[in-house]
């Protein structure tokens, strides 16, 4: 249901189908509105409706192949009132023949930056500014080919721990304002959102709608 109901962002600028998926674009190169009906997103929708496995959804399929319930499965079951299939039962009504959809997302999962006051053991520099000893664990991520290795290196997070690529992107804020009348649910993660001034800016926008 995720490709038909919302988008997710990651601190490095990634725009994703959901918080678990691989990126379909980046805020540096495209807006949320462009990503919503990009060729990549429309192809994901086509594959989902044809029972195929989109490459960007591989993290969920990897879990399912091991017998573990994935985020994808949790949101397509009607046994949970919180599943997207129950929250947005009419999501596919506005789907066009070319797999495009109106830019009227009912939900978003937002990560704007990695500002945080904690260094949880399961975390990493992309999600917390407190992670300053990445070199001590990076080898474990390298062995599994984790995207974090390249992300941390390309953003220079080994030396300067803060990353926030959304704050100065005018089109991001313009797109958020466009979506305000349609939002039914917005989920925040980080970093620690309550430390982030941008989080309060979004809350102010939401409170006006």
Enumerate the predicted regions with their spans.
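Conserved alpha-helical substructure of the radical SAM core
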Residues: 67-209
């Amino acid at each position: 249901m995720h490709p038909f109901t919302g988008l997710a962002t990651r601190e490095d600028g990634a725009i994703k189908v959901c918080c678990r998926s691989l990126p379909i674009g980046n805020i540096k190169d495209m807006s949320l509105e462009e990503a919503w009906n990009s060729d990549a997103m429309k192809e994901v929708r086509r594959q989902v409706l044809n029972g195929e496995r989109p490459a960007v959804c591989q993290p969920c399929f990897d879990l399912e192949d091991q017998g573990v319930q994935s985020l994808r499965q949790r949101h397509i079951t009607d046994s949970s009132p919180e599943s997207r299939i129950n929250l947005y039962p009419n999501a596919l009504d506005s789907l066009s023949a070319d797999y495009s959809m109106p830019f009227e997302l009912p939900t978003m999962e937002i990560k704007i930056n990695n500002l945080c006051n904690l260094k949880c053991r399961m975390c990493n520099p992309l999600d917390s500014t407190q992670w300053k000893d990445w070199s001590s664990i990076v080898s474990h991520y390298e062995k599994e080919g984790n995207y974090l290795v390249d992300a941390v290196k390309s953003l220079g997070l080994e030396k300067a721990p803060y990353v926030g690529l959304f704050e100065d992107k005018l089109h991001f804020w313009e797109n958020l304002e466009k979506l305000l009348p349609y939002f039914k649910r917005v989920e925040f993660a980080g970093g620690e959102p309550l430390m982030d001034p941008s989080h309060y800016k979004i809350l102010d926008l939401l409170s006006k709608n």
